[in-house]
Amino acid sequence: MNLKQEKIAVLLGGTSAEREVSFNSGKAVLEALLKQGYNAHPIDPKEYNVANLKKDGFNRAFNILHGRGGEDGTMQGLLEQIGLPYTGCGVMASALTMDKMRTKMLWKAFGLPVADMKVVTRETFSELDPQAVVAKLGLPLMVKPSLEGSSVGLTKVKAVEELKSAVEYALKFDNTILIEEWLAGDELTVPVLDNQVLPAIRIVPEGEFYDYEAKYISDNTQYFCPAGLTPEREQELAILVKRAYDALGCRGWSRIDVMCDAKGNFRLVEVNTNPGMTSHSLFPKSAATVGISFEQLVVKILELSL
């Protein structure tokens, strides 16, 4: 299969809150493909009807859309309908991983470790009892929308009286909110490429947690790869991440976020099925430590498209 003879659509931009990030990722991917002689073209679904890709001579899609409409199974379903192979996870894994609550429930059913949480919806918000939540989960707490990516709508709650307003804020972004125990240990993210678990990255944000600013804007967020884990811990983490990836039916590539609790136990947090591919991005950083260049990584992801 010579992919250089194919016409490739790089899907970027889109309509989610992460449109700008997707543009940055998409430009980097496009550049890498063009540099290596691929017939690649930028396609923004906000401006172009993706249902016409096949009719317009495209043979395959590199999907680097982030968030809703690109990473949640809808675009994957559309590409399946028109019979166009695409990179990354299929419909089910994409839809499921976009929903943090259901992802965690599935992991829990598989016996995998996740943070303790309380789910609040727009309908149940009026019944929220902050005292009871704090009694169960302790303080501080993390409040986040179940469906929004890129750390949008997150709040760290340090006092019981802050809980309601944090949930109200998160409800601006989604109808389902997670209130979770605060995980005080290391923050790690672990890429998986073609069933191979790549080295973990340890994230040390300047602020209290890895929010939108730390993720995309700040140059003061520190990333360590290798993560400084012992070989045994790295191995334990890799096995856990692979089990988490397989439980959800992921394929091609994904990045799984993991936190440690105060005792150092791993807790699965969430999955990015279309991880960022910008200069700040973590997947390429990890791949580089095992000798995979950005260009090689882009081609490998493309070759894994189904």
UniProtKB/Swiss-Prot annotation:
In the Enzyme Commission scheme, what number(s) does this protein have?
A: 6.3.2.4
Which reaction(s) are listed as its catalytic activity? 2 D-alanine + ATP = D-alanyl-D-alanine + ADP + phosphate + H(+)
**Protein name (Swiss-Prot/TrEMBL):** D-alanine--D-alanine ligase
Protein's job: Cell wall formation.
The pathway where this protein functions is: Cell wall biogenesis; peptidoglycan biosynthesis
Q: What class of enzyme is it?
A: ligase
Q: Name one GO molecular function term.
A: D-alanine-D-alanine ligase activity
| Family indicated by similarity | Belongs to the D-alanine--D-alanine ligase family.
Q: Which cofactor does it need?
A: Mg(2+); Mn(2+)
Which terms are listed as keywords in the entry?
Answer: ATP-binding, Cell shape, Cell wall biogenesis/degradation, Cytoplasm, Ligase, Magnesium, Manganese, Metal-binding, Nucleotide-binding, Peptidoglycan synthesis
Q: Can you give the residue ranges of the ATP-grasp domain?
A: 104-303
| Residues annotated to bind Mg(2+) 2 | 270, 272
Q: How is the cofactor bound?
A: Binds 2 magnesium or manganese ions per subunit.
Binding-site list for Mg(2+) 1: 257, 270
Predominant place of localization: cytoplasm
- UniProt key word Metal-binding: yes
PANTHER family, per database record: D-ALANINE--D-ALANINE LIGASE, D-ALANINE--D-ALANINE LIGASE B
Q: GO annotations under biological process?
A: cell wall organization; peptidoglycan biosynthetic process; regulation of cell shape
Taxonomic path: Bacteria, Pseudomonadati, Pseudomonadota, Gammaproteobacteria, Pasteurellales
Q: Name the positions where ATP binds.
A: 134-189
